Amino acid sequence: MKYMTVGNELEGASQLILGCMRLAEHDPKEVVSVLETALEVGINFFDHSDVYAGGQSEAKFAQALSSAKIPRDRVLIQSKCGLRDVHTNYHFDFSKDYIISSVEGSLKRLQTDYLDVLLLHRPDALVEPEDVAEAFSQLHQAGKVRYFGVSNQNPYQIELLQKSVEQPLIANQLQFGPAHTPMLDAGLNANMLNPLAIVRDGSVLDYCRLHHITIQPWSPFQVDLNQGLFMEHPKYTQLTETLHAFASDYQVSFEALVLAWILRHPAQMQPIVGSMNPQRIRSMVAAFDIELSRADWYKIYKSAGNPLP
């Protein structure tokens, strides 16, 4: 495992994050096994949201920490807020009162006095930056949140928040993986008249690198939010075969090879993996033992149907 500083602020974070969205689907003994395995291989950073399983993922995480007698200071806990009424009238809410009440709820479920990181989940079109700033300052001054960041936001959305928020925004969660590369496509096709040249995210990758914001890639094995795993998608047969071949060459698991491809990018990303399988978690850490050559990295990129200009 390698360790990093998130956003030039939070030191000692594992470069691999365990995503806890599906934690609630497993029984208490399985959850303990997952957490113990993660810590055993060096993962100390855990990602949550107040909406994952209606808050039950946070609660089960806390129960597992207690059962396994894992000290709070051995883990870095990140949670997210801003999504409301997910199963009824789904919408976004970055109001001061809702941010504070969401954090209070997460702290109670997680049985902790503080979050290491709080992220705003998806952009709220009705956001009032001053409201967010007041919420963040109140939470920070009370010692309830150490650091702050965002999720799925473009450069101007971040700029708008940072204009009022006094704390640095240290992370931005964005989907990224071999089958989901809009962060790369536009830059590689600059000045070209093809669909890949369309800038869809405001050049967020370069922006985050310039402003010391750590990108946390989510769902690295998926096509997008609604199309499932790329390994099961007929459009990505060549990509899957290429990755399997390289995994064999480098003598690592398929999952480790995918993560190695992400980690090869010099942006120092911090990928999120959501596996609840201890054996698979162990195998993923081998991603840090290899470094893809430029030729191999680009071959994987092209095998997903991305021609170079």
Where are these regions (language model features)?
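Beta/alpha (TIM)-barrel catalytic core signal, keyed to glycine-rich beta->alpha loops juxtaposed to Asp/Glu
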Residues: 129-309
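N-terminal binding-site loop/beta-alpha segment at the start of enzyme catalytic domains
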Residues: 1-75, 141, 222-224
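Acidic-and-aromatic substrate-binding clefts and catalytic sites of carbohydrate-active enzymes
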Residues: 23-29, 49-59, 124-128, 151, ...
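Active-site groove signature of glycoside hydrolases
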Residues: 108-128
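Active-site mouth loops of central-metabolism enzymes
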Residues: 19-29, 87-97, 126
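Structural motif corresponding to the early beta-alpha repeats
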Residues: 68-96, 121-122
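Short, acidic/polar
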Residues: 26-38, 94-109, 156-159
